[in-house]
Amino acid sequence: MMMMQSRKIWYYRITLIILLFAMLLAWALLPGVHEFINRSVAAFAAVDQQGIERFIQSYGALAAVVSFLLMILQAIAAPLPAFLITFANASLFGAFWGGLLSWTSSMAGAALCFFIARVMGREVVEKLTGKTVLDSMDGFFTRYGKHTILVCRLLPFVPFDPISYAAGLTSIRFRSFFIATGLGQLPATIVYSWAGSMLTGGTFWFVTGLFILFALTVVIFMAKKIWLERQKRNA
């Protein structure tokens, strides 16, 4: 059984390496792919929502596909800010469709991070996220146990993608991870999409602040529940 599992991991690992090699070849040899990746990285580096909007919109009928690919790109390169894409989607496609696009694409990105970590192991993940960041994510899993994914998804200041990578290094089942991710990120996606499509200036930050307050309240409640459960087990 263990041998079969190990063999399957190696098959997945080889597949990922082949895909990565194919992407590098496409970036080097295909002008369209080269331009897309370079423009994507430049838009993120500028931390400019309007710049990302213009970039997505420039692809016309393929704008939604480009937005989806951008979310996948930022998931793999964890330091890139996903909220810029969420705001851009809301502005371009409206609160509902933009929010749905952001939610589904971020779910796909989270699943990819989980899969990469599970197949490639800690050494590769540390190179993608940084050892310090990954160690801090380990601390969340130690503190919150099985509730970690849901708790961290509700906290807007906890990095989204490193948690996905860290989860892939644990024994958590993919199904549990995926459900907790979907539920946990839904409130933030709704608020950011609504705020991004309708609000500006001080009102936007007021609504965002309310969401952060709500998220902290939920996390405090869950932390208390987890603490009480541990007290009962230790009694």
UniProtKB/Swiss-Prot annotation:
Keywords: Cell inner membrane, Cell membrane, Membrane, Transmembrane, Transmembrane helix. It is a multi-pass membrane protein. It comes from the Bacteria. GO terms for cellular component: plasma membrane. The keyword Ribonucleoprotein does not apply. The VTT domain was previously called the SNARE-assoc domain. As there is no evidence that this domain associates with SNARE proteins, it was renamed as VMP1, TMEM41, and TVP38 (VTT) domain. Belongs to the TVP38/TMEM64 family. This is TVP38/TMEM64 family inner membrane protein YdjZ.
